[in-house]
Amino acid sequence: MLSFLGKSVALLAALQATLSSPKPGHRRASVEKRANGYANSVYFTNWGIYDRNFQPADLVASDVTHVIYSFMNLQADGTVISGDTYADYEKHYADDSWNDVGTNAYGCVKQLFKVKKANRGLKVLLSIGGWTWSTNFPSAASTDANRKNFAKTAITFMKDWGFDGIDIDWEYPADATQASNMILLLKEVRSQRDAYAAQYAPGYHFLLTIAAPAGKDNYSKLRLADLGQVLDYINLMAYDYAGSFSPLTGHDANLFNNPSNPNATPFNTDSAVKDYINGGVPANKIVLGMPIYGRSFQNTAGIGQTYNGVGSGSWEAGIWDYKALPKAGATVQYDSVAKGYYSYNSATKELISFDTPDMINTKVAYLKSLGLGGSMFWEASADKKGADSVIGTSHRALGGLDTTQNLLSYPNSKYDNIKNGLN
C-alpha cells in the first residue's frame, strides 16, 4: 500500500486562505444546539451483512456518534415498511437463542441495541428511502393523511426497534410543491416524535435528520431555511460528483473548483456548503458527507479527460471500496487546487478518484473553519481498519465528539427484549 504524505502546515494555511466566509447573519443563526461536540456519523446498510459480511458488531463504536441504519422502504400512502425483515429483525446471530420466551427482535435491531448499551454516546437512526426507494415520497408527502401515516409508522419502528431518531433520504424533491410538502412531512414527523417523547421518554430528544444533495440543480429546489429550522442535522451528500454518468473523468468529492481544469470539477463541495448557509441553514446543522469508496474510469489519460468505460468494482461497476484502494501499480496523485486525490495507473490507464486519510484531515479542517456540525460517511463496510480508517481519521481530526447519551428505555416496544433493555 502506498503511504500518503501527512498534511503540512503550509497546506493547512493555504486551505484556510482559500475559504471565503459565508454571510455573518447566517453563521450566527439562533437555534438550539443539543449536541455537545462534533458528529461523526456513518451509514450502516442492512444489505452489508450478506456478501460484504459487515455486521453491527464490526462498527468501531468509539469512533462514531451516530449510526444511520439504511434503508426502510415506504408505500404511496406513506406507510413505512421494512425493506429486509430477515436482516432487520429475524436473523439469529451466534449468541441468539432459539428458545427465548415472548416476542423478540433479532437481526441488526438487536445487535445495534447491544452496541448502544456498550457505547452510551452512540445514537442509532432509522433511515427511510434512499436512491432506490424514493419513488413514493412525492405521494407520501402530498396529503395530510399520508404525512400522518408516514410519521406514525416511522415512529412505530423507531420505538419498537429502540432507535434514537429518524433520517429521511428523499432523492430528490423535484419542484416547489414537493419541496413544500417535504417541510410539511418533516414537521409532522417532528410533532409526532415530540408527542411520543413527552409520553414515553420525558426529557429525551429524538433526532430528525435528512440526507441532502450537493448538486445545485437539486438543492436549489429545497426550502433551505425551513429545513434549517425543523431538522437537527442536514447530512450533505458531498460526493458522486463524477462517475459512469459523466462525459469526462472527474473528482468524486472535491472541495473546490479547479479553474485550470474545470472538466475535472463539474461540482464542488464549497459552493454547496456556502449556498446552504447563505440560504438560511445554521452552519452547525450541516454535517459534511464523505465517501468511503472510489469512482473509477478506464482508458483515460488523466483527470478531466475522456475515458472509455468504468470497469469492474468491489460490488458494482465503477465503484471500489476504499479498503481496496489504491490498487496495485497505481500512483496516488493530489489536485492541490480542487483538493482531491485520485490514483492513476499509467500502464492500464485506469483512474480512481477517492478520499485518503490526508483528504479527510483537509476536509475536517475545512468544516471546522466554517463551524459545521461534523462528518458523515457512506458507508461503514468499505472502510479500512486501524490507522488508515477514514472514520477513525475523522474522529482524531475532529477532536471532541458529541457525547450526548442514547436512549435505552422503550417501554412500549412490541419486542419484549427491547422493552426490557436486553436485560
From Swiss-Prot:
InterPro entries: Chitinase_II/V-like_cat, Chitinase_insertion_sf, Glyco_hydro18_cat, Glyco_hydro_18_chit_AS, Glycoside_hydrolase_SF, Glycosyl_Hydrlase_18. Residues 23-34 form a propeptide. It is found in: Secreted. Optimum temperature is 45-50 degrees Celsius. It holds the Pfam family Glyco_hydro_18. Induction: Specifically induced by chitin and is catabolite repressed. GO terms for molecular function: chitin binding; endochitinase activity. The active site is at residue 171. The keyword Signal applies. Belongs to the glycosyl hydrolase 18 family. Chitinase class V subfamily. Secreted chitinase involved in the degradation of chitin, a component of the cell walls of fungi and exoskeletal elements of some animals (including worms and arthropods). Plays a morphogenetic role during apical growth, cell division and differentiation (cell wall morphogenesis). Also acts as an antifungal agent. Involved in the degradation and further assimilation of phytopathogenic fungi, namely mycoparasitism, the major mechanism accounting for the antagonistic activity against phytopathogenic fungi displayed by Trichoderma. This is Endochitinase 42. It comes from Trichoderma harzianum (Hypocrea lixii).
